[in-house]
Amino acid sequence: MVPMDKDNEKAYKIETKLSTTDMSLPAPLYLYDAGPGGALGAVVSNTASEGKYSTPCIIDEICTAVNEDDEVGTLIQFVGGQSVFAGDHIIYDQPTTNWKDRVDYSNIKVEDLKHGDIIEYTTSNDKVEMLRVIVRVDDIGPIRIDGDNIQLNGNMIADVISVADNGRTAIVKYVDRNGAEQYQSMLINSTTYRYDSSDGEIYNSSASDLREGDRVLINSYWWSPKLVVIFR
């Protein structure tokens, strides 16, 4: 179904894609016949919900800031260079399943966050709308899972049981929604960081840095890790 106002050029920018042009566009993508002129027009419709939690982000620095609306708040800067503005009106949430039962971060507010902590958030009007703490770096807590199963988009805190000779495949142990210990083999080919408790620093890392006994945060989709953080 084509929205009635798709031809409103004040609301939508219409671009022409040449047949010889290679380009990557966000889904979904709706194509429309440009008519007798023969050119193919494309309207890009980005329907990603702002209500969906982000991939977990590692905090690099917290500071007071003023946004473009002259609102005083908190600028949360993340490892990797991204940042987000947090005002006074934030809905604090907790992960599901046994996560909140095995570690309690319910009293942690944005002003309590610090270097190394890991959060997820949603935005509205370029500000944090909802926020949940995934890991406090000084209180990592026991192994646990967020979600009914890790096959869905979710997080787990797991222990590394063994690492294959190829340095990329690891067997990890976590606790499922029923409290039972589970073992899973995972190919670690995602963005990876290592938090070093000896100096409090966060380093770019890789699967080859995994060691037996490491405790790790794994954010994955259908067992395919998107982010791994090694705590050592």
Model-inferred region functions:
Residues 1-232:
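...the same signal can extend to comparable exposed beta-sheet modules
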